[in-house]
């Protein structure tokens, strides 16, 4: 389907072939597969590596590639990326401002991005990726309260979800603290 929509794109099932002449190599695999995938690619210093493998640090990524000076990005989206509403975290090593802007522009197409230091990735992931689950637990509890008060489940979900979206828009658009909006 991609080939039909974008006839100039080259597709292959061979990772080595795919990476050989790519400007940007995006690796989106489970963390335990990253070394097995990266080692045979023989990436060049001029290429940009983008890893979506959670928990794999820059030093390990550089070691697996054999190119410690190449630009490397760690990118952590959340599940809302499926709705183009992700809060995506980006950390960069050996990357120029132009390369950072490029990656930010790409992932801004699927939500919002924030460039943060690698040292903050774990904490930020708890807020953004695990945050989705926390928010959905709140939605589930609020829905249940509405249902117990006689509101139809479908209506309760819509009410809570829209209230949540409204609260998010208030915070994002006004850039205020939640306590300001509560009062």
Feature-to-residue mapping (PLM):
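Phosphate/pyrophosphate- and phosphate-bearing ligand-binding catalytic cores of soluble enzymes
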Residues: 128
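NAD(P)-binding Rossmann-fold cofactor-contacting core
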Residues: 1-5
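Rossmann-like NAD(P)(H) cofactor-binding subdomain of soluble oxidoreductases
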Residues: 14-90
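Short acidic-hydrophobic, aromatic-tinged amphipathic segments that line or gate anion-handling sites
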Residues: 10-15, 114-116
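Internal alpha-helical scaffold of NAD(P)-dependent oxidoreductase catalytic cores
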Residues: 60-71, 87-124, 134-175
């Amino acid at each position: 389907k991609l080939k039909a929509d974008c006839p100039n794109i080259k597709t292959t099932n061979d990772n080595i072939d795919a990476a050989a002449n790519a400007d940007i190599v995006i690796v989106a695999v489970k963390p335990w597969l990253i070394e097995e995938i990266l080692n045979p690619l023989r990436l060049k210093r001029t290429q940009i590596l983008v890893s979506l493998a959670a928990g794999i640090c820059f030093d390990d990524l550089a070691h697996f590639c054999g190119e410690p000076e190449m630009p490397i990005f760690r990118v952590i989206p959340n599940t809302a990326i499926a709705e183009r509403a992700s809060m995506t975290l980006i950390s960069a090593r050996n990357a120029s401002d132009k390369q950072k802007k490029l990656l930010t522009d790409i992932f801004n197409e699927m939500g919002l991005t924030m460039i943060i230091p690698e040292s903050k990735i774990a904490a930020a992931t708890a807020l953004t990726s695990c945050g989705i689950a926390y928010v959905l637990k709140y939605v589930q509890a609020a829905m249940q309260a509405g249902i117990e008060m006689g509101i139809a489940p479908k209506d309760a979900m819509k009410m809570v979800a829209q209230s949540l979206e409204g609260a998010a828009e208030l915070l994002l658009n006004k850039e205020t603290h939640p306590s300001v909006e509560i009062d």
